[in-house]
Amino acid sequence: MFSRVFAVASLAALALAGPLSVRDQCNTGTIQCCQQVQQASYYQSAFQEIGLGELLAGVTGQIGTQCSPISVVGASNGAQCNAQTVCCTNTQFNGLINIGCMPINVNA
């Protein structure tokens, strides 16, 4: 008898809990709006051609260029990013180059 009550109560609790809401987070810095996002390997060959290949040595992931910070609060109230919204781990030259970028969706 108690096993049935326990089983029904467990299923009811799972049904009421529902799915968890997943939100985009940027724990490593500010959310950026970048005009262009490319794999680091795309830029490594160009940097090597001009003799600056060692600057991106060891950099993996994506690199954003011409980025400007946006806030999640602003994004939900109508601020728009007409390019790629990303979360980057390292911002250089006031957003001209952002390293370690990961695309995110701020509309979720």
UniProtKB/Swiss-Prot annotation:
One GO term of the cellular component aspect? extracellular region
- Name of this protein: Class I hydrophobin 3
Q: Which InterPro entries match?
A: Hydrophobin, Hydrophobin_CS
State the similarity comment: Belongs to the fungal hydrophobin family.
**What's the domain of life for this entry?**
Eukaryota
Residues passing through the membrane, by range: none
Q: List the disulfide bonds.
A: C26-C87, C33-C81, C34-C67, C88-C101
How the protein assembles, per its UniProt entry? Self-assembles to form functional amyloid fibrils called rodlets. Self-assembly into fibrillar rodlets occurs spontaneously at hydrophobic:hydrophilic interfaces and the rodlets further associate laterally to form amphipathic monolayers.
The alphabetical list of record keywords is:
Cell wall, Disulfide bond, Secreted, Signal
- Alphabetical list of CDD domains matching this protein: hydrophobin_I
This protein's major location comes to secreted
The record's subcellular location field reads: Secreted; Secreted, Cell wall
Range of residues in the leader sequence: 1-17
Task: Explain the purpose of this protein.
Answer: Aerial growth, conidiation, and dispersal of filamentous fungi in the environment rely upon a capability of their secreting small amphipathic proteins called hydrophobins (HPBs) with low sequence identity. Class I can self-assemble into an outermost layer of rodlet bundles on aerial cell surfaces, conferring cellular hydrophobicity that supports fungal growth, development and dispersal; whereas Class II form highly ordered films at water-air interfaces through intermolecular interactions but contribute nothing to the rodlet structure.
User: Which SMART domains does the record associate with it?
Assistant: HYDRO (SM00075)
Q: What induces it?
A: Expression is not regulated by ammonium and glucose concentrations. Expression is down-regulated during preinfection stage (12h) of ectomycorrhizal interaction with Castanea sativa roots.
Q: Which GO terms describe its molecular function?
A: structural constituent of cell wall
